[in-house]
């Protein structure tokens, strides 16, 4: 039993050492992650390996998105080019200038035609006046003044009762519408009409 007595103190010493110094990690039982609260280095390395395996896939997906975006941008650029090609080209500046010049020419032609019609109307009014020398050159303003004085003279003849029996034909009037054989008082009225008409050479 001597051996047993010798072994007992050694066993007690070994137990004391085990209490003071914990067992190495290789001999300790593995703990769950929930109990430890953090992952062991081996778990971290395995997680990193899994992340490393997943990252190429994620990069590939991002690359695919970028490629899709680039393709969409290329399609949009092609659509913009197609839309730009569908627009009508602007006319050259020379054609615009020619169009404006043609419009000016048309407006000038219309104005010349209007002036011709107006000149014909004034010439007819001048010939309708009773006795105007043919060599007399009258402006448009003088023609209008003579016509207004002639109309005023005819109205005066119609309003006066004393000329009912002795009707004076306009042909007997002399330019500028002076009635021969009329009294002096009537000649004053005619002179006032002459002042309205004005003298013309």
Swiss-Prot record:
Biased composition range(s): Acidic residues: 46-56
Gene Ontology cellular component terms for the protein in this record: nucleoplasm; nucleus
UniProt main location, coarse: nucleus
Annotated motif Nuclear localization signal, positions: 66-71
Entry-linked SUPFAM superfamilies: HLH, helix-loop-helix DNA-binding domain
Protein's UniProt keywords contain Mitochondrion: no
Keyword Magnesium on entry: no
GO biological process: branchiomeric skeletal muscle development; cellular response to leukemia inhibitory factor; diaphragm development; negative regulation of transcription by RNA polymerase II; roof of mouth development
Any one Pfam family match given in the protein's UniProt record, by short name: HLH
Subcellular location: Nucleus
Gene Ontology molecular function terms on file: DNA-binding transcription repressor activity, RNA polymerase II-specific; protein dimerization activity; RNA polymerase II cis-regulatory region sequence-specific DNA binding
Compositionally biased residues, Gly residues: 74-86
InterPro entries on file: bHLH_dom (IPR011598), E-box_TF_Regulators (IPR050283), HLH_DNA-bd_sf (IPR036638)
UniProt entry keywords in alphabetical sequence: DNA-binding, Nucleus, Repressor, Transcription, Transcription regulation
Region span, Disordered: 1-108, 182-201
Record domain bHLH: where: 102-154
Signal sequence range: none
Oligomeric and partner information: Efficient DNA binding requires dimerization with another bHLH protein. Binds DNA as a homodimer or a heterodimer. Forms a heterodimer with TCF3.
Protein's job: Transcription repressor that blocks myogenesis and activation of E-box dependent muscle genes.
Protein name according to UniProt: Musculin
Gene transcribed to yield this protein: Msc
